[in-house]
Amino acid sequence: MPVRKIGWLAGLGVAALSLTPAGAQVFSPLSVPVGDAQLKLSGEAGGALFNPNQPGWSGAEASGDVRLMPELRRDYDSGLGLDLGGTFAAQDPLSRGRYDGDVIERLAARARTGLGKIEIGITDGAGYDLAVSGPKVDPGVSLDDPRTTFYRDPGTHRAVTDIFALRTEVGASSNYAKFAYTSPEVFGVQLALSFAPTEAKEFPFLNAGPPVPGRQADIWEGAIRYETDLGPASLSAYGAFAEGRAEHKLAGQEGVSDLGAGAKLDYPVNDDITLSLGGSYRQSNAHAFNVNQSFQAGTTRAGYVSTALSYKSWMAGLEYSNGIADQVAGAPRLNQNGLEASLGYTISSSASISSGWQHLGYSRNSGAFFNGLPQLKLDAFYLHVNLKTSQE
């Protein structure tokens, strides 16, 4: 399908769905009483149609993902709340996201009190939980931490972005089994701390993780988030760190060390229009943010900036990203840069759609990519639809 047709399809899709009555697209979660507890089943799905312009691949492509999120919850008169919840996903190779295609993305027990939240199980770390970045029209297809990408390695059929995925939020402990604590917000300040004993994705301490050199253990993450009003504007900012210990090390390998920060400013021009801008930065000794490639010599740095303008249910945005992974033993120096322009429309609390254009460029100081060259240029026009159960 020619690029022009994809562009027209994206524009027509946004226009058509924007005319649909909002109330018709609100999906409520299924809720069933179980004794004194409540069982709630939520879900979400995303689907993309796009036309990638890349070496070795042509024509229209599609990708998508589906998630089910059951939660069993019990609230007590004392203010204590207990729940057991999970996220179970199915996706194709271009929508594997930051959890690398895990079927079980989250499965954790949680206790909530006036003193904060405690989680035990497969869940995100403190840094990722409190992360702040620039505004995103559609987080699912953003340059930063996307769920869906548009480019496929013609040899492996996996996402090209597996080479170096830009994720500026601190997240060294991924969804490894862990203990996590998040404080309540006090005077705009919120704190979080997490500990993952291993890289295993079971209950903490039950498994040592994958049998690979440089395997990480004892990963601590800490984060602080601050929110305040600056006159009519609102500001959010965060900073985070992660530190781990390497096992079965090769020469030069060490425990992962991760630092990151981000901020976002929202300014309401009037009752209908809001201008937003922000960004985030991360640096790590993990080559291309692969924690099993953490080396004493070599740093990976990534930055992301974006701005967006919202008008009622519409949102237009522009994103820029850049990443550099220093050369380490067995891996070349990698450079990545990206640019994205997008337009989105929120149909209801359960449905939204976006379309846009994205460019990614990669380069390396030795060897070649699948196109036989040390440079790789990619771009795509896309249409992306999001559906989810409403929390309202």
Regions found by a protein language model. Name each.
Residues P29-L49, W57-A200, Y226-D229:
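Outer membrane beta-barrel
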Residues L41-G43, L84-G86, I118-I122, L191-L193, ...:
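Membrane-embedded beta-strand positions of outer-membrane beta-barrel proteins
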Residues G47-N51, G86-D92, D124-A126, F195-E199, ...:
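Transmembrane beta-strands of outer-membrane beta-barrel pores
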Residues M69-E71, A108-R110, A180-T182, A223-R225, ...:
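Outer-membrane beta-barrel architecture
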Residues S78-L82, L115-E119, G188-L191, G231-A237, ...:
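Repeated loop/turn-to-beta-strand initiation elements of outer-membrane beta-barrel proteins
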Residues G222-A341:
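Detector for outer-membrane/organellar transmembrane beta-barrel domains
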Residues L376-E392:
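Outer-membrane beta-barrel "beta-signal"
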